[in-house]
Amino acid sequence: MPGYCFEIFNVFDFFDKTNKANFWEFVRLEHAQVMDIPISGTVNHFLKPENLRKNRYHDVTCWDNSRVVLSSHGSKMYDYGDSDGKKIIVTSQDSDSTYIHASFVNGFKEANKFICCQGPKESTSGDFWKMVSEHNSSVIVSLTETDDEDQVCYEYWVKEEDYELAFGRYVVKTLEIIEESSFTRTRLRLTDVSSDTSREIHHFWYPHWSDYGNPTNPAEILNLISKVNQKRKEMKKTADSQPGPIVVHCSAGIGRTGTFCTIDNALSQLRKEQTVCLPQTVLKIRKQRHSSVFLPEQYAFCYKAVRYALIREIKKKFFY
């Protein structure tokens, strides 16, 4: 990055560095250096009085330059009549807001691969599904538990097959729930009743990652990242139109979410260029998603996951 010099490692140098006795102390110092780098930008839309209630946390800001902008639908009401018990009406009214606490984030040499956002609140779930619809996203990754009190993340989809949630013009039906080894994959159908159009959404839910901790097994996150990318690749081949960004969220949308995107970027860089530079990767993400990877433990986990992935690939190459 201009003005900041970080070492770019090839695979062998990366292993050599991570094998040193003082490496994890070095990682903590490197994380502090990255956190101290000033990033210029404004957060005016985050601070607008009419948007304050849409922010889950008052101290987790959202950049203006990379924010996701929604269209204005007006505040039309939709009459769903007497639902059959399997359709839950969260709200019958469209949201007229163009603001959502969400940011475009690049992949490695792939513009806007991700939309990183806060965990939807009950009052912003309609905006969330509007974002998914308008930006043609087909894959959602949730890295947090949900809770009835809406303190962490509202349950914006139903964890039971054949049930539906209605958010104004958007109806989300759970078609199939597939329990994988460490996460849950759900096939959803998103319908825009105003145009009578629908499409399939693939939802990946990994609730075992605590807010201030890390997964005990890096293989779980690596497997999740692999399955998410595999599904997106499949949809690129079969969809009528190119799938939009992968939507990733936790609760605030910066810690676990930023860590997920960092690992994905680093692995892509390794595959394409056989090099990796985690501080540079994190800094790039922080320029698009404010305050990402803010904990040293999250930063260290990025190193652990990349190292684990490399060891696994070497074992496959030489022992299988």
Curated annotation (Swiss-Prot):
Against SUPFAM superfamilies, the record matches this protein to:
(Phosphotyrosine protein) phosphatases II
Protein name as it appears in the record = Tyrosine phosphatase H3
Q: Catalytic residues? A: C250 (phosphocysteine intermediate)
Record carries keyword Cell membrane:
no
Record keyword Hydrolase present: yes
Q: Which gene encodes it?
A: H3
**Reaction(s) this enzyme catalyzes, per UniProt:** O-phospho-L-tyrosyl-[protein] + H2O = L-tyrosyl-[protein] + phosphate
Name the InterPro entries on file: Prot-tyrosine_phosphatase-like, Protein-Tyr_Phosphatase, PTP_cat, Tyr_Pase_AS, Tyr_Pase_cat, Tyr_Pase_dom
The Gene Ontology biological process terms listed for this entry are: symbiont-mediated suppression of host innate immune response
Q: What is the lineage of its organism?
A: Viruses, Viruses incertae sedis, Polydnaviriformidae, Bracoviriform, Microplitis demolitor bracovirus
Instruction: Tell me where in this chain the Tyrosine-protein phosphatase domain is found.
Output: 22-309
> So which domain of life are we looking at?
Viruses
The EC category is hydrolase
Question: What are the UniProt keywords, alphabetically?
Answer: Host-virus interaction, Hydrolase, Inhibition of host innate immune response by virus, Protein phosphatase, Viral immunoevasion
Which family does the record assign? Belongs to the protein-tyrosine phosphatase family.
Q: What is its EC number?
A: 3.1.3.48
User: What's its job?
Assistant: Suppresses host immune cell adhesion and phagocytosis.
UniProt GO MF annotations: protein tyrosine phosphatase activity
